[in-house]
Amino acid sequence: CTKVETYEDTPTGNFEALWHIIDTKYCFLDYKAEEYGLNWNTVYRRYKRKIDDGMSHAGLFDVLGEMLDELRDGHVNLYAAHDVARYWDFREGYAANFSEEVQAHYLGTDYKIASALRSTILPDNIGYIYVPSVSSSIGEGNLDECLAALALCRGLIIDVRGNGGGNLHYAETLAARFTNERVLTGYICHKTGTGHSDFSEPQALYLESSNRIRWQKEVCVLTDRSSYS
């Protein structure tokens, strides 16, 4: 059997619960310690002093949000009915470098929409596909139709600027149309215990080539600081 820690529904109890969840389940504590000196035990002592069982829900929310900010992780959020505590310094601390006006000029208004794909043919017979997100479905049929319509183009631009990510499966479905062979894309480890270094052995991740329409000509991928996740 597995022992499950229980905590009182008080500011102190909720603080303890959240700190321990991060301490035992968050994957990157050792990496953050090496990268910028994060010490999660020091974080505990620093923020424990700010907790009082008489504080308001909003006050507790603010302290817990500040504590999570120490992780410097845009994927770590705390939700409440009145607000979402988030870490957005990775993008708010930098000037925007993607102009929707310029992009709209090239995409125009007479473009095709196939699920998450926006496509058109630019001057000089260059195909253009804008992928603003991979949060919504990119189906095999969508890709068949899109690539077939651009088949006579002499080259292709895939624009993922401003793409805030989403579902890895949809990204792989798109990428599989641009390789004729199996490609090693990375490695993954799974958390196996409560210790900061408790991970499985790395497992290789491969992208399989699609058995449907694949692009065989030149292709250019446009990215920017907002292409992530």
Predicted regions and their residues:
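Flexible, low-complexity junctional segments that flank or bridge functional domains
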Residues: 1-207, 218
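Short, conserved loop/helix-junction motifs that constitute active-site signature segments
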Residues: 212-215
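Short, intrinsically disordered, charge-balanced linker/junction segments flanking boundaries
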Residues: 226-229
